[in-house]
Curated annotation (Swiss-Prot):
UniProt key word Cell membrane: no
Species this protein is from: Geotalea uraniireducens (strain Rf4)
GO BP terms in the entry: translation
Identification of the protein by name: Large ribosomal subunit protein bL17
UniProt keyword annotations, A-Z: Ribonucleoprotein, Ribosomal protein
HAMAP family: Ribosomal_bL17
One of the record's GO cellular component terms: cytosolic large ribosomal subunit
Any matching Pfam family: Ribosomal_L17
Signal peptide: none
Lineage, broadest ranks: Bacteria, Pseudomonadati, Thermodesulfobacteriota, Desulfuromonadia, Geobacterales
Subunit structure of this chain's protein: Part of the 50S ribosomal subunit. Contacts protein L32.
Amino acid sequence: MRHNKAGKRLGRTTSHRIAMYRNMVTSFLNHERITTTDVKAKELRSIAEKMITLGKKGDLHAMRQAASYIRDKKVVTKLFTAIAPRYAERAGGYTRIIKLGIRPGDNAPLSVIELVEEELNAPKGTAKKKADVKKTAPKAAAQATAAKVEDTPAVEAAEPAAEEIVAQPAAVVDPAEECEAKAD
């Protein structure tokens, strides 16, 4: 029975699975974003966050622990010098998983796993202010364009240059709208 056993098997032997995780963590910390399947991304998240936590400790023992799992010494150096200091004030949640859809060949659900890049020093009230700005922005934009239209004098348009004609895409006409226009 499989009681109290953490992690997914992913249809691989233990050695293959561990090697795959080590390769994925090395690539993830090197590129800071990779595309993989949903299940692999969820498993990778826990390992990567443990590595970043080791990087935040910053001592020699933590560096050796990370080096025993990560395959490339340059990536270990990057983890301790560039990645971990970014998350010094963050208590966890260093990664984000974004679902992409399905892979055409085998219908596997794909995701992008990436490091979170937002600033923690922003005041907590900014989210509400941004939502208010988003609600009022369309109204203000509509009023501004209406004011511009009223203020601009009517000028007859000259023939457009040949470059402008080529640069403009052809108008797409919906057949349903065309039938309605003929019926009127």
